[in-house]
């Protein structure tokens, strides 16, 4: 598939997600990075977003809870080019009933070439990157070209 450029604005659209055992570590990270996160547009799955919004006093667009379809909603936003960065504190030691949704979410993040952090260290690397505060161009699949070639 051919690639095209997609321009990310200086204010990124950041998705925040955490499995149940990782909600407190994500909250602690968000509290530590709160002032920087305020510069961006924040999205989160339902339970995580509600908790972060209340505790960190941040404006967050909340989707459904992950097991109720929130991971899939987030995947759709990624595919539509409406999410720039995914911060996903997942629990590598415990399986969740919606593991297929989680795998699909991570797959879409890879397909659409968005940065993904699955732990605190990587999240810090992403937040400290100069590209988080400036416009940045990424290469993404040319879906319009793909569709045109498949339907001609």
UniProtKB/Swiss-Prot annotation:
PANTHER family: METHYLGLYOXAL SYNTHASE. The lineage of its organism: Bacteria, Pseudomonadati, Pseudomonadota, Gammaproteobacteria, Aeromonadales. InterPro entries: Methylgl_synth, Methylglyoxal_synth_AS, MGS-like_dom, MGS-like_dom_sf. GO terms for cellular component: cytosol. CDD domains: MGS. Catalyzes the formation of methylglyoxal from dihydroxyacetone phosphate. It catalyses: dihydroxyacetone phosphate = methylglyoxal + phosphate. Substrate binds at residues 19, 23, 45-48, 65-66, 98. One of its GO terms (biological process) is methylglyoxal biosynthetic process. It is an enzyme of class 4 (lyase). Its EC number is 4.2.3.3. This is Methylglyoxal synthase. GO terms for molecular function: methylglyoxal synthase activity. It comes from Aeromonas salmonicida (strain A449). Belongs to the methylglyoxal synthase family. Residues 6-152 form the MGS-like domain. HAMAP family: Methylglyoxal_synth. Keywords: Lyase. The active site is at 71 (proton donor/acceptor). Pfam families: MGS (PF02142). The gene is mgsA. SUPFAM superfamilies: Methylglyoxal synthase-like.
